[in-house]
Amino acid sequence: MEKNKQALLLQAIEDVFAFSFSKYAKYIIQDRALPDLRDGLKPVQRRILYGMYQMGLKPTSPYKKSARAVGEIMGKYHPHGDASIYDAIVRMSQAWKNNLTTISIHGNNGSIDGDNAAAMRYTEARLSPYGFELLKDIEKQLVPFVNNFDDSEVEPSVLPTLLPNLFINGTSGIAAGYATNIAPHNVGELLDGLSYRIENPDCDLKAILKIVKGPDFPTGGLVYFEQELANIYQTGKGKFVIQAKYETNTAFGQNQIVITEIPYETVKANIVKQIEELISDNKLSALESVIDSSDRSGIRIIINHKDFLSADKIMAFLFKHTQLQVNFNLNNTVIANRCPVRVGLLAYFDQFLAFAHELIINSAKYDLALANKRLEIIKGLIKAVSMIDEIIRLIRRATDKQDAKTKLIDKYAFTLNQAEAIVSLRLYQLTNTDIKVLFAEQKELEQTIQTAERLIAKPQARNQLLQAQFFQYKKQFNQPRRAQIVGLIEKQKVQDSDFIEHKEVGLLISHDGIYFKFEPEQLAKHLVEFKSEQDQLIFGGVVQNSDYFFMVTSLGNIITVPIYKTLSNTKTKMNELLAKKPILMEDEKLVLAGIVNPDKMEQQLLVLTSQCGMVKRVELSKVINTKQIKSSCCMALRERDKLVNAFVQTKGEPKLVCLVSSSNSFATFLAEEIPIISNKGIGVKGIKLKAEEKVRFAMPLQDNDALVVINSDGGVYNFEVVELAVASRMSVGKKLIPKTKTPVSCFAANKHSEIIGHRGKNGSDLFTLNELNRLPKSTVSQMRLFKWS
């Protein structure tokens, strides 16, 4: 116990955390998330390739279960869970994620639609030809090997590849304090660029960029950049914009846009879903339908559209609102000399070529050592064959193998290796050896030694070998460029208003929040057909599809909605008007709906009246919000109060405002007496009310108007403005109709006004004021009446 106590280390907890996290962060940076500059691989990818190589899973070998490979790799090299290993194997096999796949999977390895791969127990895997090439000459020990996690195995610290894999397939990852996002490039362009750099070591970046034209994504697309390409590849950091490639078509009289290539790292099914949501939400009325007709031959997303917008404009809208356009933020952060650094294209080429020279030197040294050792033996065998009889007698007289070796060394001056080779041969092999074959092998070995020595000594020889190897790789792995480099992107401010169908539409809006948009010629028909015993219309008319309408609610809120974003030809509740965006609270009613007129809005005021008699005016331009569909306050209300009326007043008109209470009191006063205050103000008293008395109606009055009052038994009362007792604000209302009569409708009208009379289930009729006066009371009593125009 005392011994254990002495072994304890007392240390502050913050120091323990700091040390542990810094150690962990260093591990994450160096050995997990960032790729090595030389082979372009993260540790898990390198271990997968090496583990499968050790299992003999060559491109020509039979496939083996992925689960077996995962178990081997996890048990020997990467003890971080089977899921991470299998996910990496799957990604390394996906052609839409890599320009050249390093692993070949037999079975379901996922799809560009985001489908998961089959479980590892169902799929089979092996190295692809490209992946196998990354491991070429691994057995020569050309690179340092390190112990695995439990020191039971060794693994390469880097693969001895002469392929610029870092830029061929690209990669991405996030470490502690560092991130990387390297774009894939065309293998042929990279190999040509490396060859050009070898021939012209002093060339500048612009010369290389004539060969390496930019990223080449496996899914194709159009590539733009926001700054000069040279700046991006000089610093190793910048932004590319990738757009889908499309073509236009007409089939069976239907205008079509056909998407044939999508941006890198996007999911096709998600793109189709985004377009479907735009259609269902009526975000762009030109869109009609989308069909995914993709198959094994390639991507084919068909978008049917109306012809009032061009295909280019529709695609501009889709680029803004879907993943048909994405940004690729280039960040070439890699591990070089065990440190994270950001490299440009020239820096990468130079460091990769330096690594390639190192590999060639190590390979030449390895070949040289083997050739010298074999040449020593061949020379001994040639010497032995020339004195075959003496050698045979010596071996037969020897007491054992060691005695024979000693005598060969002492008597004939053979080296130890030569003597070992001679005594290891059976006598019949020794006697039957063809000296011509030995001389031919000697010559071949001497040439090998000469070549190896030249490669070790002369950089020019190594460069020639590299260029020949790059040429061979280009023949073996080159692919046509998929992504089209367009150039600098022109920043265009695309607004939703650019995509509106400019036409007239009919529009009806009711007190209960029923919204109906239809063809303008059907207005009269829908007015007559409007049926509701409890609801009533508050707006109707022919408007422009590009207009905005605003609504004032009983809770003192105002909402502005663009008409072009709403659905047509169906009666819709206001909370279903915009998908996933309720705009009215429960029991919230509409008291006013109108069209926003930007040219007149600065001269317009919104006059608001609550049932408790509060009135206020607010500048319309300060409460209208056309940038977003959002309910905002236009009048603060006390508890148990609600808005009963709102109307728009042009400054200076109308002159009078009339409030009608639940006890038939009519208070008329000048509109100028109502103060203009902020949207969150409560307002001022407009009429003196008795206990339990409420304001039921409020309306503006012009000089030539008549105040029309309809009571419950169908009586119609018309009062000229001069008959009203105009008083000051906050006065007691005047009794204009008998106390026994209950007003059910009240509005200002003139001889040109039209009145709508709702007849319940029988529909609605339009009347002039004079016609209404001539109707029998029994007919009027069955109607809910209000002014139409």
Curated annotation (Swiss-Prot):
Task: Supply the SUPFAM superfamilies for this chain.
Answer: GyrA/ParC C-terminal domain-like, Type II DNA topoisomerase
Q: Where is this site: Transition state stabilizer?
A: 121
Per UniProt, which keywords does this protein have?
Answer: Cell membrane, DNA-binding, Isomerase, Membrane, Topoisomerase
Question: Topo IIA-type catalytic domain location, by residue?
Answer: 34-499
Q: What residues sit in the active site?
A: 122
Assigned EC number: 5.6.2.2
What is the enzyme's main class? Answer: isomerase
Topology versus the membrane? Peripheral membrane protein
- Mention any one GO cellular component term assigned to this protein in its UniProt record: chromosome
The record ties this protein, via CDD domains, to: TOP4c
Cellular localization per UniProt: Cell membrane
Question: Reaction catalysed?
Answer: ATP-dependent breakage, passage and rejoining of double-stranded DNA
- Matches recorded under InterPro entries: GyrA/parC_rep, Gyrase/topoIV_suA_C, Topo_IIA-like_dom_sf, Topo_IIA_A/C_ab, Topo_IIA_A_a_sf, Topo_IIA_dom_A, TopoIV_A_Gpos, Type_II_DNA_Topoisomerases
The protein's matches in PANTHER family, at most eight in alphabetical order, are given as: DNA GYRASE/TOPOISOMERASE SUBUNIT A, DNA TOPOISOMERASE 4 SUBUNIT A
What this protein is reported to do is described as: Topoisomerase IV is essential for chromosome segregation. It relaxes supercoiled DNA. Performs the decatenation events required during the replication of a circular DNA molecule.
Q: What is this protein called?
A: DNA topoisomerase 4 subunit A
Q: Which organism is it from?
A: Mycoplasma pneumoniae (strain ATCC 29342 / M129 / Subtype 1)
Name of the gene: parC
